[in-house]
Amino acid sequence: MSLIANPKVSDWLEFHPSGELSIHTGKVDIGQHISSALVLIAAEELNIKPNQISLSPIQTGSSPNEGYTVGSQSMQHSGYAIKKAAATARNVLTAQAAKYFDVPVEQIRIEDGHLIVDKTNQSISYWELTKDGQLECDVDETANAKNHSKHELQGRYHVSREMLDIVTGRHEFIQDLKLPSMLHARVIRPPQYHSTLIELDEKLLDKFAAEKIHLVRDGSFLAVAAANEYSAVK
């Protein structure tokens, strides 16, 4: 499902000149640590260190559209897509390195994101081969993932990057955030998914304005926002 809506490698992976990689997902980490799992998948397939990878903040307008984060489907959808995107990127960049050095693909090995010609000191990195940071080719779903017998990260002991902050109390949950001029909001749920907002009660709008409650409308999406949470809930 995820690859149908987001078929390009660049929808999932972005190489940065600094030697880092961003991975994109449409799944939200709400405590299940999917972010750590997705980082490990990409790191395993691309032979780079997990600390070289960051998960891009999820944004409606730019992140892959993967629908809801429900039903334990994040690995099935986003995990699969990132694995295939990473395997495709590895194959494409290995082929480019082989062409660059004029050697067979079989003579290229990968260590920490560097494509090295066997028995030589010749090497080139993923980041040198992707100077604009993007791979605009389609994800190849037939690209073979790394054989599990060669896994160096998956299935092995790994502490997720945010775990230390969680167990020591330094981690900030969304309920802990207090920002300047922050508003609390509640979405007004329609009776069914395909409902269309036809009109709004003008008297209700006047009442909201008098109580300094903001109404947010985008098409059939409707929400209220207020300076305190109780007013928004009420």
Where are these regions (language model features)?
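Cofactor-binding beta-sheet edge motifs in enzyme active sites
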Residues: 1-234
